[in-house]
Swiss-Prot record:
GO terms for biological process: clathrin-dependent endocytosis; ubiquitin-dependent endocytosis. This is Putative arrestin-related trafficking adapter SPBC839.02. It holds the Pfam family Arrestin_C. Residues 481-504 are annotated as: Disordered.
Length: 504
């Protein structure tokens, strides 16, 4: 293939022909034989049942483990944690996220416990089906990212015999009599025992990643160990999602992608696409403007989302690059032997404009392993580029060689693809609305804007919400009082007080 010398790094001009090789297959999201189910999201894989009947109020209790003696439930203050910043400089300037919640142990009958423990762990795993060089024995590599442990109760530690170290507890009235039921360090009587936990998570930790050849995952794991030798341990696990969000102080992320170039003094083109940071499932505007300076005839306009995936292991000494994925987002073609610009808006002579909208693939495409958001983890690197392809014909062009009849201009612009949870409704401060359970938060934020609007309307309805603030008309008039003192009077009195104090 003939590639001429390029004048700049943005655009690449080369002849197009039906027999051109070296192109990756194009993924047409609208022409697939099987479409992914929009109701299936990457964040709904693990279902955790709710825990009802607990006295201690929390956002939502989720059941982790249960047996004939007790059950363990957990409530998270925030079901999703956001780590702002993408580059090292942005991460250092941001504050840490905080993982906090409550752990409840509900006892059904008197039991002796040895230890109550909660662990927060983060792990990464990359798959290598062909084997890791040089020996090719290992087919995967797993690393530990973090491991933090809270020991709420231990039989060897001295704690209160009634609460057993819990911040809140409630014993059934039948077992409240200490004369008939003497207290001991290990014995837990039927009731509820709540333990709070809190952990700051630095923004330097990687976000949660889920691909076919690698993943990064975090989870909370509980351990309730009984004192008896033959009574097993009760364990439970709940996943925690860490989402990478844009930096709050960065202005460059909201700037649009704008490319303005000229080619051979025959064509001047301007392409503007959305923003440099786009959210999965978001609809972004696209604007095209072409100025014909010579005899140029347009035939096709296409917009691609290019995804590149790299996997590393053995301290980044081994690398594997997957085939670049081309997702066709937008396409406009002209009929045979006609010009594409004939249907466009003509601003001035030989100046044409087109404005349209493009939908970015959503999280249901991510669940189908079609696309994934950008990552910052060194061992799993995923980057994206918006590629604009302009196909046209031009007479007497030096780039046309052989049987090629058309020319194509490739315009590559880097873009950062964010998770669908990074919509404005998730990253901005919440409205005054009822508490939304964690099961509803697991849905994609963009697909549930209608639900969010319903909750917002419900919050503003004073007939439904009894805690709504009163209207301005319901306030009674305040009786007249003396006006506040002047600033000079306060300053003089303060100065005289200081002088008297100095004299003393």
């Amino acid at each position: 293939m003939y590639i001429p010398n390029l004048r700049n790094y943005h655009d690449k001009v080369f002849p197009y022909g039906p027999s051109s090789n070296g192109y990756n297959p194009v993924i047409r999201l609208t022409d697939r034989t099987t479409q992914p189910d929009p109701s299936q999201h990457i964040y709904q894989e693990e279902k955790i049942s709710k825990c009802e009947g607990l006295s201690y109020r929390a956002r939502e209790w989720l059941l982790l483990s249960s047996n004939s003696n007790a059950r363990v439930a957990i409530a998270l203050a925030e079901p999703v944690l956001y780590l702002p910043g993408a580059t090292s400089s942005e991460i250092q300037s941001e504050h840490s996220a905080v993982l906090r919640g409550s752990l409840c142990i509900q006892i059904y009958k008197p039991v002796k416990l040895k230890k109550i423990q909660l662990s927060f762990k983060g792990k990464s795993r990359t798959e290598w089906p062909e084997g890791i060089p040089p020996k090719l024995f290992d087919t995967y590599e797993e690393n530990s990212i973090m491991n933090h442990c809270w020991v709420f109760f231990h039989s060897e530690q001295k704690v209160d015999e009634n609460s057993h170290g819990a911040v809140w507890y409630k014993v059934l009235p039948h077992y409240a009599d200490t004369a008939h039921y003497p207290r001991s360090m290990e014995c837990f009587y039927p009731g509820e025992y709540v333990y709070n936990f809190e952990l700051p998570i630095s923004c330097t930790y990687p976000e949660s990643i889920q691909t076919d050849m690698g993943r990064v995952y975090y989870f909370l794991e509980t351990l309730v160990d009984r004192s008896s030798t033959f009574s097993g341990k009760s364990t439970g696990r709940i996943p925690i999602e860490l989402i990478r969000s844009p930096c709050s102080t960065s202005v460059a992320t909201s700037e649009p992608i704008l490319v303005s170039k000229s080619w051979e003094d025959r064509l001047h083109y301007e392409v503007q696409v959305g923003e440099k940071c786009v959210v999965m499932g978001q609809v972004v505007p696209v604007n095209f403007k072409f100025t014909l300076l010579g005899e140029v005839k347009f035939h096709k306009l296409r917009l691609f989302l290019m995804e590149r995936r790299y996997y590393y292991c053995r301290q980044r000494s081994v690398r594997r690059k997957e085939k670049t994925r081309q997702l066709l987002l937008y396409e406009r073609s002209a009929p045979k032997n006609q010009c594409l610009l004939s249907d466009w808006k003509q601003v001035r002579p030989d100046v044409y404009e087109l404005s349209d909208q493009v939908r970015i693939p959503g999280c249901h495409d991510m669940a189908a392993n079609i696309v994934h958001f950008d990552t910052t983890y060194p061992n799993i690197k995923i980057t994206h580029t918006v590629r604009t392809v302009l196909r046209f014909s031009c007479e007497n062009s030096p780039e046309l060689m052989g049987s090629a009849k058309y020319l194509e201009i490739y315009i590559d612009s880097p873009v950062r693809l964010l998770s669908c949870r990074c919509s404005d409704g998730s990253t901005m401060l919440p409205a005054y609305c009822p508490i939304i359970p964690s099961s509803e938060v697991n849905f994609c934020s963009i697909d549930n804007r209608i639900i969010a609007g319903m909750n917002r309307d419900l919050a503003l309805d004073s007939d439904i919400i009894g805690n709504s603030p009163p209207s301005f008309d319901s306030w009674t008039a305040v009786p007249y009082q003396a006006p506040p003192p002047k600033y000079d009077d306060i300053f003089q009195s303060g100065s005289s007080h200081d002088e008297n104090h100095d004299d003393n």
